[in-house]
Amino acid sequence: MSIHIEAKQGEIADKILLPGDPLRAQYIAETFLEGATCYNRVRGMLGFTGTYKGHRISVQGTGMGVPSISIYVNELIQSYGVQTLIRVGTCGAIQKDVNVRDVILAMSASTDSNMNRLTFRGRDYAPTAHFDLLRTAYEVGVEKGLKLKVGNVFTADMFYNDQPDWETWARYGVLAVEMETAALYTLAAKFGRKALSVLTVSDHILTGEETTAQERQTTFNEMIEVALETAIRVG
């Protein structure tokens, strides 16, 4: 057991999907995994382990934001030995050629969070996806006929921001905004693990188009299928 996860040793697979929403974790377990059992209910942050195409896979809710995902990634790696971590979440598009429901593979993540500035003493660090996962996810998406977007995302510390300045990030090619990827990639690098974020565009910051809360919780299956297939293909 760790502070925030009550699983016993061996109950969590070495490959795990990380949705922010614990109810999405439950949806993934019930919809895609065989024989799924719940190993964590602490703070309502549900975690499950089952099998996908015969491969053992876990799925763990992380909550929203850098501090929350950092807690779960640290404990999953240090207390349970997880090797491969794939975030499956939502993001807001800031490019005109990115549409609601598009799937984005986050190659890298810019951020306004001070986590890395504190870690690296004021210097910049470039949080980056693991190449094997990124390449495999792209190949899986192409096989499924998806129009994937691959590029930089922006990990924001604030959801409600009075001075967001998305225009600057968009001008430099950032595809979308979310709240966790920079932390995931940094911690994976620190501990020598593999990490990737597979994101579905849930809303468009430029146009105002958005999906419903129910859709965010129980749809977006293409993203989940890409993540699961990627997890079982990469050793």
From Swiss-Prot:
Keywords: Glycosyltransferase, Transferase. A purine D-ribonucleoside binds at H4, E178, M179, E180, S202, D203. The record marks R216 as: Important for catalytic activity. It comes from the Bacteria. It is an enzyme of class 2 (transferase). Its EC number is 2.4.2.1. SUPFAM superfamilies: Purine and uridine phosphorylases. It catalyses: a purine D-ribonucleoside + phosphate = a purine nucleobase + alpha-D-ribose 1-phosphate; a purine 2'-deoxy-D-ribonucleoside + phosphate = a purine nucleobase + 2-deoxy-alpha-D-ribose 1-phosphate. Phosphate binds at G20, R24, R43, R87, V88, G89, T90. The active site is at D203. It holds the Pfam family PNP_UDP_1. One of its GO terms (molecular function) is purine-nucleoside phosphorylase activity. One of its GO terms (biological process) is purine nucleoside catabolic process. InterPro entries: DeoD-type (IPR004402), Nucleoside_phosphorylase_CS (IPR018016), Nucleoside_phosphorylase_d (IPR000845), Nucleoside_phosphorylase_sf (IPR035994). One of its GO terms (cellular component) is cytosol. Belongs to the PNP/UDP phosphorylase family. Catalyzes the reversible phosphorolytic breakdown of the N-glycosidic bond in the beta-(deoxy)ribonucleoside molecules, with the formation of the corresponding free purine bases and pentose-1-phosphate. Homohexamer; trimer of homodimers. This is Purine nucleoside phosphorylase DeoD-type.
